[in-house]
Amino acid sequence: MEITFQKVEHRYQYKTPFERRALYDVDVSFPSGGYYAIIGHTGSGKSTMIQHLNGLLQPTNGTVQIGEHLISAGKKEKKLKPLRKKVGVVFQFPEHQLFEETVEKDICFGPTNFGVSVDEARQKARKAIELVGLEPELLTRSPFELSGGQMRRVAIAGVLAMEPEVLVLDEPTAGLDPKGQNELMEMFYKLHKEKGLTVILVTHNMEDAAQYAEQIVVMHKGTVFLQGSAEEVFSHADELEKIGVDLPMSLKYKRAIEEKFGISIPKATLSLEDLTHEVVQVLRKGGHESCSS
């Protein structure tokens, strides 16, 4: 299910003295089946942008085409329920939205709300909890008896139980320890590969953006600043830093090595393994030349 923004503008508190423009002139497409990252400094428009993906926000100007659904400025989309089934959104700290007395009831809430029978919802809950790497035995437990990481997985299972075609992740690993962050990101990538899910990840973690995303969209002051593969985007390191976007650690180490040893590493290395390989190659070629990047 392809998603396309055309000349999208969004203003909060439109036509009031408190009006504030959060998005403008946003032109971007997310073809079906891809893995995308949206990055940018705090306040760049990332969260506003993703709230247009399932009709939580409507553009002030422009259009958002989500599969067969067209959301236009000034026109109310009447069939948002089917859209919200197809586009699942995992907001920051989704565990704060848990409220039922058992894990099973919490996961079943979404499917039953969309008209699925109780028995079918239970089947979906069992599949979903296994997808997020939890034991089915937890279905009878209170979600509030679980660890923070388990609670987050339960909340994500509630989104997956609706079997969305698009999974939107807003800082999904915020507040987790490094091990929990890595496990969750690997889980999302596995779902993307095995289920063919389109994944749109909003993140401040540049390592995650570089490692997982096929395409990266850089937002700045409410519009698209850069778009391309990780290699293309992070080759603009100086420009990214000027707009407050962090760089992957491998690029920071690359700069430090170039400055320390007076060598030039031409390739934009996006992992420490790549960086090690490139340094070895340069040194083998006698690369002690003045640093040019």
Swiss-Prot record:
Cell compartment(s), UniProt: Cell membrane
EC number: 7.-.-.-
Disulfide bonds: none
Keywords of the record: ATP-binding, Cell membrane, Membrane, Nucleotide-binding, Translocase, Transport
Tree of life domain: Bacteria
GO molecular function terms attached to this record: ATP binding; ATP hydrolysis activity; ATPase-coupled transmembrane transporter activity
Family note: Belongs to the ABC transporter superfamily. Energy-coupling factor EcfA family.
Function (record text): ATP-binding (A) component of a common energy-coupling factor (ECF) ABC-transporter complex. Unlike classic ABC transporters this ECF transporter provides the energy necessary to transport a number of different substrates.
Protein known as: Energy-coupling factor transporter ATP-binding protein EcfA2
